[in-house]
Each structure stands twice: as structure tokens, then as C-alpha cells.
Amino acid sequence: MAPSSSSSRSSLDVPESDSLAIDEEKSIGLSTKSAYPPSSSRKENETEEEEEAIDPSKTPRGRRRSQDTHSLKIVRSHHSRAGGDGYTCFDAEPGKPGKQTGAGTGAGAGADVPEEGSAYLVSWDGDADPLNPRSMSMLRRWSIVLICAASSLCVTCTSSLYTSTYGQLMPEFGTSRLVCTLGLSLFVAGLGTGPMVLSPLSEFYGRRLIYICSFTFFLIWMIPCAVAPNMATMLIARFLDGVAGSAFLSVAGGTVGDMFAKHELSLPMMVYTASPFVGPEIGPLVGGFIVEGTTWKWCFYVLIIWSGVQLVLIVLFVPETYHPVLLRQKAIRLRKETGNQEWIAPIEKLDRSVSKTVLWSCIRPFQLLFFEPMCLNLCILSAILLGILYLFFGAFPLVFQNNHGFSISQTGLAFLGLFVGMITGICTDPIWRRIYGRLVQQREEQGGEPGGSEPEFRLPSTIVGAWVVPIALFGFGWTTYPSVHWIVPIIFSAIFGVGLIWVYSGVFTFLVEAYPVYAASALAANSFARSYFAGAFPLFGVQMYNNLGYQWATTVLGFLALAMAPFPILFFRHGKRLRGSSRYASA
């Protein structure tokens, strides 16, 4: 065990901007000064002279061994986000304003945890503690990231691959295209509903158990889809399948944060975040070739095989990474090995029940949507964009099959424009990071604290993307003539993909930093709005394109996006004042 540095500081010794980061560590059992015992990792035969050398005044002969451990380094942070994610569900409650310092991954954020003087509070034995997920090899951590990203990709691909089956489902079940589209809408609605329950459950039982259970049911509910005797069975199974698969869209971001320190987090989080947006574009591409050569059932057989492989990988290679649950396991082992029942982990001192946590995780997102104009407008903006993306699954076949004579597999290939655009948008991340760095530097030059930031500094990509999107939609709409080469609307769809990624990258980080105490709820509100808009838009998309024409239907969508474009600029300029008058946002 590596002893803590003598220069380790308490929360009283650091600037206010550092205190949030320290409170994060306390919430997941990471000591910021020599106050906690190093669990029982010291060798039993360690000499008393060594103990006295650590702190002679506190370790006389016969007393407990010294408590001298310091785990993850304190990182200056403007916002509190333990582990680097905003996916925890332990938001503060009314009447407990002082209990919560951030939305961190720690169990105990927003709940009572043992005070710093507690003698038997279990914490990590330094950075190299073998139980600490951040001590795993880089290869293993990246393999876990890739498995989580592939699982998320599988779920979102399942949402859109289904759209390739419409042509065969309608005559077989004697139903309309609108009813078939309900299968897409209900699945996406399930993706927005599931996190309300699965996210808080992961705070109590760990991420691994939620992954295994949810993905098992995701695989199980795929079977009724593949053998559905009627459309009602298909629709019910699709909704439940979406609920089950939503865990990797809501919980897996926390897994990435568990394994990587903040200075390492950017690239793995980018890889994971990209997968839910890339998946929908792959679905029609794969599904088009499947149904062109065989029946619609094989779309689900392929997904069952893929999901089965992912489930095996999850069971074999994805361990528990949630720090509070791991510390609880460590405390249980210590009590068993030492016979001392005083050893305790922070999560074991929670004063909130599972049902109460789930209830708050369902209520808080709607409070933010109803009472926070910044959260509401940014959620509407991102929801409209995802709704348009899913509407394209109905619009693309109309445009490219009717105007250009594409087959169903060729129509799937048309989605490569969106795919390339999104990948391009992801690759521009270093540009926005440099802009963010310049804004931070300007703030320092104007008298701000070194390293300090403002949530609004995350919005430049959203500002640009919010204007790129309507331009791309107008361009796409007015090039959907048979006389215009098919590559032109595909190019504009790629530009739409770039703008969509730029909008989301800024919105997500802004919400987490602007609402540090309620980051999980802010993200849940965004996810809920996005999912239900994405579920609703396809239901009227085809009718709108048929009644208004391809050009004017897309123009309506462009004006809808254009109406939301000024809001990121307003929030960039006046966000600090709005946050100052907010009951939920950071000042």
C-alpha cells in the first residue's frame, strides 16, 4: 500500500473550486487526508515501530494501526461529477441541500455517508489498489469500453433495422405501414422509459448485474419478435425489448467514468458516446441486404445471434466497476476476515430506500423540464433533431426509391451519408476542445480562478451545429428532385449528421456542468424527451412527405430546427444570469 503524500490537503486547505472534487471522492470512499484506515491491507506482522513512525501521537502501542491512505488524485474541477460521468441517480432532495455536492458516481451523493472521522470507513488503498477499476491494465479497460460500446450499438441498431421489414410485414399481417411504424416508435419509447428505473437500480446493485439482467431480457424479448404470429405480439415485444436494452444507453457511461481518471476520459467516452448515434444508420444498411435475400424473420435472427455474442462477452469480460458497490464488497470481506463488524462502506450508510430512489429518478427530470428554461429548450432542440433522424427512416425510402429507383438494399446504403457525417462530427472534437481552452484562458485573464470554467463554454459546438442542421435540411429538401443526382441529397444528409453530433456534444456536457447536483436528472430529462420525439416523428413522417411533397415537408422540418437555433446563443450570452436565478442550476 502506498502511503498518502504528506502534502495531501483537506477540504479546509483548498480553494472553493477544489472542494467539490474532494467531496466527490468522499462520497465514493476516497480519503483526502489521513483519516481512514487502509482497510486491512497492511500486513498483520507490520511492526509497531513502523506504525509509530507514521503518526507517533495517534498510534501508541496496542492501538489501531494508522490510517494513512490516499487514492485518486484531487483534480481541480469546476463541476462535481465523480468518476467523470453524470449518470448517478442520487440527486439531492428538498430539505437536504447540503447533502449533495455533485451528481457523481459515488453512492452517497445526496445521502448520508460516514463522517470523515469514522475509524472503520473502507476506502481504496491508494491508486494501485487491485480492487480499484482504475488499476486495471489499459488493455482490459479498453476491452470493456469496446464491449459496452458494441452493446449500445447493437441496441440502437435494433431500433432501426426493424424498418427494413415493413414491406414484408404489411402483406403478411394484413396491416398498414402506420401500424408497422408503431414497432419503431414503441421500441424507442422503451429506450426512454427504461433508464428511469434501471439507472437508480444500478446505484444499489451495481452495473454488472444490471447489464447481465437487462441484456438477457433484451435477448429474450427478441424471440417473440422473430416468431410473432400477429402484429400485436410484435408491438408489445418491441416495447419491452426497448426497455430491456436501455441499460447500455443510460448506465454504461458510468462504467467508462469508473475506469478512467478525468485526464484519460476524453477518448474512451467519445468512443462510447458515438455508438448510440452510429447504430441507427447501420440498421437500414444491414436490414436492406437481409430482407432482399430472405424473409423479415432473419432480421431478428441476426440480431438474436449478435445479442447472444454480446451477452457472452458481457458475462465473461465485463466486471463490476461501480466504486461504491466494490467498496461494499470489500467491507463485507473485511468483516468476515477480521471478525470486526465495524468495517463499513459509504454505500452501507445510505438512508434512502430503493423505491424512494426510483421514485425521485422519475420525478426530478420532469421538474427540470417544467421549471428550467435552459434545460427545457436544449432538450427540445436535441429531441427535434433525433426525431428528424428517425423520421428519415421513412423519408429515405420515399425519396430514393421513388425518385431514383433504388432497391431496398441501395436505400440502406443511402444512410452511409449520415454515418460518414456523424463520424466526421466526432473527429472534430479536438477543435472544440481548443476553443474551450481559449475561453477558459480568457476567463483567467479577466480575473477568474486558474483552471476555472463556466458551463456556457461547452456551447460553441451547439451554437454552430444548431445553424448547420437547418441549412442541411433545406439543402436536402430542395435537392430531392429526380433530375438532381442522388449523391447531392446524400451529401446534405451527411452535413445534417455533422450538425447533429455538434449539437449533442455541447448539450450533454452543458447540462452536466450547469446542473451538477442534478446531472443525472438533467440527462434523464434529455433522454426522455429525445426518445419520445424520436418515437413520435416517424408516425407522421410518411404522411407529411406524401401530402406536402418531399421538398416542402423537409422545409417544414428545417424551419422547426431554425426556430430553435437562437437559443444556444442566448444561453451562451445570458446563461450565467439565468443560472443565478435558478433553484436547480449552479450559480
Where are the model-predicted features located?
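A six-helix transmembrane bundle that forms the core substrate pathway of small-molecule transporters
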Residues: 118-587
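Intrinsically disordered, low-complexity terminal tails of fungal membrane proteins
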Residues: 1-140, 318-360, 433-455, 577-587
